[in-house]
């Protein structure tokens, strides 16, 4: 009898065959599912604590997506030869899984839940992120943990006017869209996408298509749950103390309503903190035991009720705007004197100082990914220090949120970047958030675009981003343009759209409630387009296009092409030639396999000097051309003369002067500079030179004729120090040497 009660479900999903399996591996976890998607295999596990920690006031969900290098048949390249800290892709995929799962846990469920996904095998044409999403959903669904799932997920491409389900990297190279959708059978929960300036209706169609295809996975997971699901937890939300809630409402609602009449974020924050403190003090004065966390949660609920009811009633928002107005915008470029490009983008109380730095090929980011190594010449880094929100906190390496926001901004800008052959620089953009009150990632998109244009990067178009919010109560809803931080915290959706006047370049949506409808997404996209066009108008006013001149502090790139067979000449033995060249000229030189050479320098004269040297190194000697160079070596039969860098030609003794030359040293010395003419070159690159061809012939000089040899001219034999013509006539083949009179003894030749 088998140890395992293995349950397997297999289904065809577009071009992929997918298998879900449970019951054999990781049986001590709360739920474990292996997903095999055409050779990409992931193990998704979930474990939940049986009880919440005392005083816990939030839901502690952690998701860790871990790629094992053995999945691609590799050994880690680190010193310790094992996997280390998460890569950027692992962090982004962990967030991708977390976002659609989090809103499906019931309110009040504060038990710690940990989802861990291991990539065990990787087929590069079947991306592991979709398999990881499906596996995480299935593991939670069979675990019995309180969870209002399962969810499905799908990747959508757009190739030749048609949507494509779960395209691999090869197909994505030809796709105008890379979109991931996740949601329950009823509604969409999460969208993450990058697009090549596509119109809103194509984007919405992609979301709907992806949701429909994701439901195929939902139905299979439900079948798996029916056969392999564990008993549901006997969990009930904590009972509400209605009398205590009424008391807190009575003490705090009026104070909080007054606080939310204040338009300034800092003043409003101080007022709400004061209201919290007064309510806690009043409760303490009554002598009752006060659970601070419980009271603060109730006061937060009051805040949400106030803000949401005002908006749904058509009243002004927190800062006095209506639902469609964008906050005031201020833009300044060339903010920093010695950076290559910079811009300060301010929208209301959100501000981004964005800096662009241009680099060379050596500055590109080399990424050793599981699917293979590649170089990335465009980097976007987002930083938000605690002072941006008037708080204290940890400063150091980027957190998951910062990595995610940087990636979103990068996605928005990639479609408008120039091609490498148009602009060969490596580009690094850093967004420093100096103030934050909502939508700092979209401020980073706007500032990043302006900063690159200030640096002279020839972008195809301006790109702007806007964050939309949602307040939904039953069938009533309001979509908010350019949300504040409080509206984000108290609302139901964070919907970010970036793009040009032509179309959308990036879209990200996170839902806090259990899904939104197609109608709401249509309204949000239309409203976002209106706001985006408004912001783009402001950006064009501030900076109409990319500067034509780069900063004087930016490196200049000079590109030249050489014969690929000459690459080794430029590099030299052990890299000696190119190393000396870079040190002498102070430039950076990069050589590609096709013979393209890129020279980087902040000094144009130095770059030109390097180009000249390379031209000389790779130059071919031209027959009939006169060169000047030093004598590098004296030989018995002539001399070697350096006519080009790394190229010596032979000046034969017979080509030194019109008169007979007995000793080369009578005419030449090592180091002597002479002018010579190229007589000929051969297929091996050997060069024959002449000095006498440039000298005047002496009066009455007659070129000495030399007899032709019977078996063809084998060239000069200068190593004998004289002409072959001085020799006596050669014996005919078979002639015997003159010897004694004939005898009867046969000669050796006669035998």
From Swiss-Prot:
Q: Which reaction does it catalyse?
A: RNA(n+1) + phosphate = RNA(n) + a ribonucleoside 5'-diphosphate
Q: Where is the KH domain?
A: 555-614
**Entry EC no(s):** 2.7.7.8
What GO biological process terms does the UniProt entry carry, in alphabetical order?
mRNA catabolic process; RNA processing
Q: Which InterPro entries match?
A: ExoRNase_PH_dom1, ExoRNase_PH_dom2, ExoRNase_PH_dom2_sf, KH_dom, KH_dom_type_1, KH_dom_type_1_sf, NA-bd_OB-fold, PNPase
Alphabetical list of HAMAP family matching this protein:
PNPase (MF_01595)
Enzyme class name: transferase
Query: Which source organism does the UniProt entry give?
Result: Methylibium petroleiphilum (strain ATCC BAA-1232 / LMG 22953 / PM1)
GO cellular component terms, A-Z? cytosol
Keyword Transmembrane assigned to the entry: answer is no
Coiled coil stretches, renumbered: none
The record's keywords, sorted A to Z, are: Cytoplasm, Magnesium, Metal-binding, Nucleotidyltransferase, RNA-binding, Transferase
Gene (UniProt): pnp
Biased composition annotated in UniProt, kind: Basic and acidic residues:
700-735
Q: What protein is this chain from?
A: Polyribonucleotide nucleotidyltransferase
- Residue numbers spanned by region Disordered: 700-751
